């Protein structure tokens, strides 16, 4: 079971919940996290200010360079937490908070576009409720850097907000266990890391934690990302700033397809959780000759899944690796998607397809797929975190894995992949990749199977793992996609018959002079 949150975190959440009735629940995160950022930045500023005074004297305490050199934001007087708390009970406290955030952003170019603009004044929150929230945030000791209290609280809130918002919301957040799994598989120790739909920046945060955990050097990782939603773009910038992580998220929040902020980027690692089954993502005559589709069919307007895949492929460097999530339908879609999928397989880009357990996500209860693409599946030696890894040639092979039997209960109806679950998956994947895999890897019924190109071609280039992995349990070996398509066709026929019968009945009544209006 997941560990329970600390009383401090719970108290902060309950304080945020007091906003109920004043603002929409979907706004909680923006109200709370911006204030939390203000408290954090102010505490760091005051600590640095005291250190400068002790080392260099009072006359240097307002020289901005003495702050920025240590990744500390310089705060003008009206932006400091002490000033906010002195005025917490005043009727114009919302305006003072807006002014504080504005002046911080103006004084620190790295925060351009990160903080909300005139936000608290527009919300019109009751002064007493806002003061209560400020009091709760004021109790947080942000000096506890050893235990990463800042990151922990921020992460707790992002997850809690995603849980509270539930289906159809919370797209800004990918559960930590999934991000950790992707990082453990693609191992982004050094080079360029890119996320084309970065949400609140969780992929970046967990990737750098992975590097730290394995005694790597975070400075060797350059981060690039893009986010479409303006409020989530700001969340990402704050989330990264809180941890002192430098990142290029583009000039502004923007649509990755129509306003690519990193057109010439070639990334060594790509991690992504794109919106599932995004419809009408481009107009019929839009992006038809986009260079990202070069060598492939143009992805259909009805579903963006393969648009995301080809965007990712176009960004991979010569030895680039990508790990991203998609709805299961992308494994076996027909028509244009099948043509694109076949070409991806023929081009030796698909490395692994991993079905995840249901109920991992806060936004959907369906099972989703983790895709691993690799630009270079040839035999070679690679230096990773000070160790030389010898990879075998895997050009005409794809590893299929099924994790639906994994996961432990988490937050009532959800599950999470445990550390031991992730370790098993990563060990299996890396054993399959590496030289001498015949001794370390084997196909395991109901878990994994290494399929040849010929096997995949024989099955019509479907990437549904259950078509390859051996299942003893007959329910698991059921071709879910084929069954669902059959049911879909049957239901469509029944609905068509119903519509015809309804039309015939209405016509009879009309002819009798008793027209029924529907």
Which residues make up each language-model segment?
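Short, contiguous acidic/charged loop-to-helix segments that flank catalytic cores in large enzymes
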Residues: 22, 281-303, 328-336, 357-363, ...
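Conserved Class I SAM-dependent methyltransferase catalytic core
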Residues: 11, 18, 27-40, 233, ...
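Non-catalytic, mostly N-terminal accessory regions of nucleic-acid modification and defense proteins
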Residues: 1-189, 248-261, 355-358, 382-388, ...
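Extended hydrophobic-aromatic, low-complexity segments
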Residues: 279-283, 323-324, 333-337, 353, ...
């Amino acid at each position: 079971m997941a560990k329970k949150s600390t009383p401090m975190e719970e108290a902060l959440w309950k304080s945020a919940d007091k906003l109920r009735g004043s603002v929409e629940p979907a706004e909680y995160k923006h109200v709370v996290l911006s204030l939390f950022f203000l408290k954090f930045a102010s505490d760091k500023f005051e600590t640095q200010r005291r250190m400068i005074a002790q080392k260099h004297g009072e006359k240097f305490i307002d020289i901005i360079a003495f702050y920025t050199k240590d990744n500390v934001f310089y705060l003008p007087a009206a932006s400091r937490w002490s000033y906010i708390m002195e005025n917490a009970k005043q009727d114009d406290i919302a305006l003072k908070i807006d002014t504080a955030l504005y002046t911080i952003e103006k004084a620190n170019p790295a925060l351009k576009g990160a903080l909300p603009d005139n936000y608290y004044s527009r919300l019109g929150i009751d002064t007493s409720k806002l003061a209560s929230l400020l009091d709760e945030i004021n109790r947080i000791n942000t000096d506890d850097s050893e235990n990463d209290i800042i990151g922990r609280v921020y992460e707790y809130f992002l997850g809690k907000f995603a849980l509270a918002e539930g289906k159809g919301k919370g797209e800004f957040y990918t559960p930590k266990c999934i991000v950790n799994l992707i990082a453990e598989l693609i191992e982004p120790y050094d080079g360029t890391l890119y996320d084309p739909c970065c949400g609140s920046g969780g992929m970046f945060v967990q990737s750098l934690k992975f590097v730290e955990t394995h005694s790597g050097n975070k400075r060797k990782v350059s981060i690039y990302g893009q986010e479409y939603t303006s409020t989530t773009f700001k969340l990402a910038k704050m989330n990264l700033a809180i941890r002192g992580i430098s990142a290029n998220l583009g000039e502004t929040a923007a649509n990755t397809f129509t306003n690519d902020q990193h057109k010439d980027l070639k990334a060594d690692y790509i991690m992504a959780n794109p919106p599932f089954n995004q419809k009408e993502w481009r107009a019929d005559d839009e992006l038809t000759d986009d260079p990202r589709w070069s060598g492939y069919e143009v992805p259909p307007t009805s579903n963006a899944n393969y648009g995301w895949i080809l965007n990712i492929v176009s960004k991979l460097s010569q030895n680039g690796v990508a790990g991203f999530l998609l709805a299961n339908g992308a494994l076996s879609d027909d028509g244009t998607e099948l043509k694109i999928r076949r070409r991806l397989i023929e081009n030796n880009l698909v490395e692994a397809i991993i079905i995840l357990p249901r109920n991992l996500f806060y936004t959907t209860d369906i099972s989703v797929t983790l895709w691993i693409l690799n630009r270079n599946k040839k035999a070679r030696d690679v230096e990773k975190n000070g160790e030389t890894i010898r990879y075998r040639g895997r050009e005409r092979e794809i590893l299929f894995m099924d994790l639906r039997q994994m996961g432990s209960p988490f937050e009532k109806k959800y599950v999470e992949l445990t550390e031991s679950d992730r370790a098993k998956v990563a060990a299996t994947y890396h054993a399959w990749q590496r030289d001498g895999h015949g001794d370390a890897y084997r196909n395991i019924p109901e878990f994994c199977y290494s399929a040849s190109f010929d096997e995949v071609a024989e099955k019509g280039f479907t990437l549904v793992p259950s078509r390859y992995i051996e299942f003893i349990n007959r329910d698991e070996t059921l071709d879910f996609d084929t069954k669902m398509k059959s049911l879909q066709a049957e239901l469509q026929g029944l609905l068509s018959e119903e519509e015809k019968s309804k039309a015939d009945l209405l016509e009879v009544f009309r002819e009798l002079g008793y027209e029924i209006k529907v």
